[in-house]
C-alpha cells in the first residue's frame, strides 16, 4: 500500500468519529480536529487544530474535559466535563469563543458524555444525582435561537453511574451505558466496587 493511499484511508476512518481523544469537525471549510488538553501548570483547554497541526484555538476552561459532542449542523461543540465535574463548555468552532458554561443543578454532576439529537435541538447529558447517590440521570437541554442551552427536563438512566450514551441508527432510540460505579461529587473515588451493577 502506498503512503498516500494509507493516509487517505486513515483520514476517512477518522472522519466523524473519536480517535484517541480527538473529534473531527468539517463544514464547508477546512477540517478541524478537536480535543481537550492540560498544560504543565494544570490549566485546562478546549482546543482545535488543522490537519497540518496548526492550532486554531485553545480556549481556557475551568474543569478538565472528557468528551466532545459536536452539533450536527451548527459550528458548535460541547466539551463535556470529566466525572465528577459540574461544568461543561459550549464552544464556537469557528472562533474558539466560549459561548456558554453549562452548570448542572446543585444536586448533580456530569459523567463525561453528551449527545445532540439528529436535528440539534436538544442535548442529552449523562449525570449523577448526589441527593440519591448512584441514581443515574440524563439531563435534557434545549438549544435556543441565541445558541444557548437551557435545562428543560431530567430522565432516569435506569441504572447507576451512566457514562456513554449514543443514538441507535433509527435516530429515536437513545442507548445509555450505565457503568454501575457510584461516585460522589467531591472526588472520583468509587464507592461500591464490591456491589457494582453495570447495565
Summary of predicted features, one role per range:
Residues 63-69, 109-113, 160-165:
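Repeated scaffold domains used in trafficking and secretory/extracellular systems
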Residues 126-133, 177-197:
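Short, conserved, GDST-rich strand-edge loop motifs in beta-rich repeat architectures
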Amino acid at each position: 500500500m502506498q503512503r498516500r493511499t494509507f493516509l487517505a484511508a486513515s483520514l476517512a476512518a477518522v472522519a466523524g468519529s473519536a480517535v484517541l481523544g480527538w473529534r473531527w469537525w468539517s463544514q464547508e471549510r477546512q477540517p478541524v480536529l478537536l480535543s481537550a488538553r492540560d498544560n504543565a501548570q494544570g490549566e485546562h483547554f478546549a482546543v482545535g487544530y488543522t490537519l497540518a497541526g496548526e492550532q486554531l484555538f485553545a480556549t481556557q476552561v475551568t474543569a478538565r474535559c472528557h468528551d466532545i459532542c459536536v452539533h450536527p449542523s451548527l459550528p458548535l461543540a460541547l466539551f463535556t466535563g470529566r466525572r465528577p465535574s459540574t461544568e461543561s463548555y459550549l464552544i464556537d468552532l469557528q472562533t474558539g469563543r466560549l459561548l456558554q458554561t453549562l452548570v448542572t443543578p446543585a444536586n448533580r454532576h456530569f459523567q463525561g458524555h453528551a449527545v445532540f439529537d439528529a436535528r440539534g435541538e436538544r442535548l442529552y447529558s449523562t449525570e449523577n444525582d448526589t441527593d440519591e447517590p448512584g441514581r443515574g440521570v440524563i439531563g435534557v437541554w434545549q438549544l435556543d435561537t441565541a445558541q444557548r442551552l437551557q435545562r428543560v427536563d431530567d430522565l432516569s438512566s435506569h441504572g447507576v453511574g451512566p457514562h456513554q450514551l449514543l443514538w441507535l441508527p433509527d435516530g429515536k432510540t437513545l442507548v445509555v451505558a450505565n457503568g454501575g460505579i457510584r461516585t460522589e461529587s467531591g472526588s472520583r473515588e468509587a464507592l461500591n466496587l464490591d456491589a457494582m451493577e453495570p447495565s
